[in-house]
């Protein structure tokens, strides 16, 4: 019997154990973050289970309501939102929540308040539910200055002040990718154990990628730098092979592939959406945080995405994120345009 191999198989690094190990390095930590994260993980497990049996349980289809973004809500959207709000409030570690599905900020009852703010999209890519494409949950966590005196300004912090961010992708497997500010790690749900196990330690995005991810259906409305970049991806003039286009239409799935294989994900501003389409607090910031922690970059077309200071909870922004060199190319094209327009 191979005891060494057997020991390796049973020495599983769960997400809770991983976060506890990280927290033990901070002598001031009291375990609050671990408790909060365990409630987020529980919410992810619940939604993963609901997604797996959505067709059988008749959770697919419209719930007959429209959310704050003007999108008709899917039944699974509504359920996922309820699950995460209840999980986060019951943790006793949050004081304010921002959800993509709720028009207003949720301020937690003072008796149940903790020191964290969580901004989340409970079910990103929900328009893909019916056809079985990967969908996911995105979240970002901030520390609040004073839990007894919480205001909207506690929510409207720049992304660079984020404490942790992550997403959970519900696809062929259920994968949770997390950063607490010391790198990025990926965990896969083992259905037999009911635990997220570390399967992708210390994720690093390649410095340059071979893939670009964008909705080319919007091409006629793009500005010059975006059009030039995509043209260069398709018809490079330096003798290099063209980049491959991969676009799913679910941000979690597109960013996950970009993170693992390299390349760039683009959702630019255009004539139809001059402020971009993706929401700052619970889409742009968490994904930018993860990308930078993995060695990549994020850019809005004007500045580093994490330097943005939002003025409202459902604010939108253009976003370019991915491999360092690819985003650098996009930044150079925008700088070139700014220079020529000021000349």
Curated annotation (Swiss-Prot):
GO BP annotations of the record are:
fructose 1,6-bisphosphate metabolic process; fructose 6-phosphate metabolic process; fructose metabolic process; gluconeogenesis; sucrose biosynthetic process
Q: Which residues bind substrate?
A: 124-127, 215, 247, 267, 277
PROSITE patterns, alphabetized: FBPASE (PS00124)
EC no. given is 3.1.3.11
Q: List localization entries.
A: Cytoplasm
Q: Where does Mg(2+) 2 bind?
A: 100, 121, 123
A cellular-component GO term for this protein: cytosol
Where is Mg(2+) 1 bound in this sequence?
71, 100
Catalyzed reactions = beta-D-fructose 1,6-bisphosphate + H2O = beta-D-fructose 6-phosphate + phosphate
Q: Does the keyword Mitochondrion apply?
A: no
Q: Can you tell which superkingdom this protein's organism belongs to?
A: Eukaryota
Disulfide bond entries: none
Molecular function per GO = fructose 1,6-bisphosphate 1-phosphatase activity; metal ion binding
Q: What class of enzyme is it?
A: hydrolase
Q: Where does Mg(2+) 3 bind?
A: 121, 124, 283
Q: What cofactors does this protein use?
A: Mg(2+)
Which InterPro entries does the UniProt record give?
FBPase_C_dom, FBPase_class-1, FBPase_N, FBPtase, Fructose_bisphosphatase_AS
The UniProt note on the cofactor reads as follows: Binds 3 Mg(2+) ions per subunit.
The alphabetical list of record keywords is: Carbohydrate metabolism, Cytoplasm, Hydrolase, Magnesium, Metal-binding
Just give the chief location class: cytoplasm
- Give the protein family: Belongs to the FBPase class 1 family.
**Further notes on this entry?**
In plants there are two FBPase isozymes: one in the cytosol and the other in the chloroplast.
Under the heading HAMAP family, the entry gives:
FBPase_class1
What is the official name of this protein in its record?
Fructose-1,6-bisphosphatase, cytosolic
Organism lineage string: Eukaryota, Viridiplantae, Streptophyta, Embryophyta, Tracheophyta
């Amino acid at each position: 019997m191979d005891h060494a191999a057997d020991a390796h198989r049973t020495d599983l690094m769960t997400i809770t154990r991983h976060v506890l190990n990280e927290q033990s390095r901070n002598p001031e930590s009291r375990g609050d973050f671990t408790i909060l994260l365990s409630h987020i993980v529980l919410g992810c497990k619940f939604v993963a289970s609901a997604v797996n049996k959505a067709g059988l349980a008749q959770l697919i289809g419209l719930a007959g309501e429209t959310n704050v973004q003007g999108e008709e809500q899917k039944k699974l959207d509504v359920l996922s939102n309820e699950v995460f709000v209840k999980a986060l409030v019951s943790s006793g570690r949050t004081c304010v929540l921002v959800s993509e599905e709720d028009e207003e900020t949720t301020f937690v009852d003072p008796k149940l308040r903790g020191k964290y703010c969580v901004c989340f999209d409970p079910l990103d890519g929900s328009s893909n539910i019916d056809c079985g494409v990967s969908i996911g949950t995105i979240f970002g966590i901030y520390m609040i200055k004073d839990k007894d005196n919480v205001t909207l300004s506690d929510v409207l912090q720049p992304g660079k002040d984020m404490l942790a961010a992550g997403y959970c992708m519900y696809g062929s497997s259920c994968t949770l990718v997390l950063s607490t500010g010391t790198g990025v790690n990926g965990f896969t749900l083992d259905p037999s154990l009911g635990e997220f196990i570390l399967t992708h330690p210390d994720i690093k995005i390649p410095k340059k990628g071979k893939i670009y991810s964008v909705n080319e259906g919007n091409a006629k409305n793009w500005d010059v730098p975006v059009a030039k970049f995509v043209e260069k991806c398709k018809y490079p003039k330096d003798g290099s092979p063209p980049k491959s286009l991969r676009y799913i239409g679910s941000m979690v799935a597109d960013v996950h592939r970009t993170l693992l294989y390299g390349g760039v994900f683009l959702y630019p501003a255009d004539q139809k959406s001059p402020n971009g389409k993706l929401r700052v607090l619970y889409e742009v910031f968490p994904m930018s945080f993860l990308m930078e922690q993995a060695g990549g970059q994020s850019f809005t077309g004007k500045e580093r995405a994490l330097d943005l200071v939002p003025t409202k909870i459902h604010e939108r922004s253009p976003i370019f994120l991915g491999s360092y060199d690819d985003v650098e190319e996009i930044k150079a094209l925008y700088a070139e345009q700014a220079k020529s327009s000021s000349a």
